[in-house]
């Protein structure tokens, strides 16, 4: 697997969960002997939803809700078969979306 690279993208609404998951992945990969670049924080995506507070009228009274999606990028350089096996066995929270390329 020399010369190859594994790119892991993490997405989550909770920044503490994504940071803990990234830390766990980096620790696991460094234990197996591969080189790690990251975690690199990518721009946070912010979605704002505007809702009228009243069910009937009073359009001037509105409430804003926002959803922030935090993203991290981890590159694993020169992965070994032991690294890939360790990544498959790692246990991450369900709130973190993992995309491996």
Swiss-Prot record:
PANTHER family in the cross-refs: 30S RIBOSOMAL PROTEIN S10 FAMILY MEMBER
Family: Belongs to the universal ribosomal protein uS10 family.
Protein name (record): Small ribosomal subunit protein uS10
Xref: InterPro entries: Ribosomal_uS10, Ribosomal_uS10_CS, Ribosomal_uS10_dom, Ribosomal_uS10_dom_sf
Keywords, sorted A to Z: Ribonucleoprotein, Ribosomal protein
Disulfide bonds: none
Keyword set includes Ribonucleoprotein: yes
SMART domains registered for this protein in UniProt: Ribosomal_S10
Subunit architecture: Part of the 30S ribosomal subunit.
């Amino acid at each position: 697997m020399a010369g190859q690279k594994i790119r892991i993208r993490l997405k989550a609404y909770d920044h503490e969960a994504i940071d803990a998951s990234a830390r766990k992945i980096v620790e696991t990969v460094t234990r197996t002997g591969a080189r790690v670049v990251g975690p690199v924080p990518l721009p946070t995506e912010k979605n704002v939803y505007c809702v009228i507070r009243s069910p009937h009228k009073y359009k001037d009274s509105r409430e804003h809700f926002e959803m922030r999606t935090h993203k991290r990028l981890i590159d694993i350089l020169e992965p070994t078969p032991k690294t890939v096996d360790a990544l498959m066995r790692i246990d991450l929270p369900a709130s973190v979306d993992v995309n491996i390329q």
